[in-house]
């Protein structure tokens, strides 16, 4: 009995020691010298044009490390290529959590991949912060308390365009060309919600694939409808083609361009600035290709950053600027954490941003969160391209209150 008792005691001590080792391993995701951050990006595949987001984030963290890190801790950014494949995203996320032991996941791109990993991260109580997607499912603290978006929602953006059309072009006929994924569907849904009982104003809508070979046919069909307003929701490379095709067909509708492609450098210049003159969009970030910001201190800092930390990057890339601003927001959260870098405190601080202004957001745009509000940026500004620069239309819009009155 005595021997058996000693063996049982030894087993219990060993089990407790293993648990302690496991807890110690968890704590190493943020120790006295390092904070590990996980990320997934489409460095290859159909959405690789957005990979500049991850590259800029990595470069931003390099800059922070050169400046001493955060509270004496260096940032270790572990970013993998998921090729926009949700299955790959889940496998890579498991590895980042279980093998690399990241403190949090940050800024991973795209709706499908982030939806694929959301349950896993919430079950493990791993922060999934500032998701690079405007899907509203990433802003529901009751359902997924460890997941938080960052940018305005796609649906809210669609409602903004619908409200603008009703205010300035009442009763005009509309056509919509939207990307056949969650982004395009959500934005199109927002347009319908904003129009309310006036959805009959939409004569034709066409969903297209990212690698669509029939863009010219689509645009020709939309022109023949006789519509006076053309709304496009898609990636920058496709947007450039569509703007040029519209001009080639001698069609001159009011052209509304989704924010994802609202970039002078990556969309409008390739399309031809003369073809893009008059394009309308809604934005929340400064456009790094816009000469209006040439004397802006924050944009001068951006150019310095690009020269030193991301010299191979395109200084006019709105995707890179997005990554820069998102990384800046995460750094603010980690600074607020002080020496308490538990995952629980990371989420508390992410939900305690008060009128925070990343340096490159448009004037009047602020980041606000609280325990019931997991949508950090809820404001946008309508802008119109005059052939050289974006001109603001009206004041800052609160996207949370953008439903249109039904006429």
Model-inferred region functions:
Residues 82, 129, 136-139, 210-211, ...:
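Venus flytrap/periplasmic-binding-protein-like
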Residues 27-58, 80-87, 109-110, 177-185, ...:
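Extracytoplasmic "Venus flytrap"
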Residues 198, 246-322, 396-404:
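Extracellular/periplasmic periplasmic-binding protein-like sensory domains
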Residues 88-91, 136-139, 144-250, 292-295:
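Extracellular/periplasmic Venus flytrap/periplasmic-binding protein
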Residues 96-109, 129-131, 173-178, 226-236, ...:
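Periplasmic-binding protein-like
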Residues 23-26, 34, 49-55, 67-141, ...:
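Beta-alpha junction/loop-to-helix N-cap segments that form part of ligand/metal-binding clefts
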Residues 306-309, 313-321, 331-392:
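Segments of small-molecule ligand-sensing domains
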Residues 1-36, 404-407:
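Short, low-complexity disordered leader/linker segments with a strong preference
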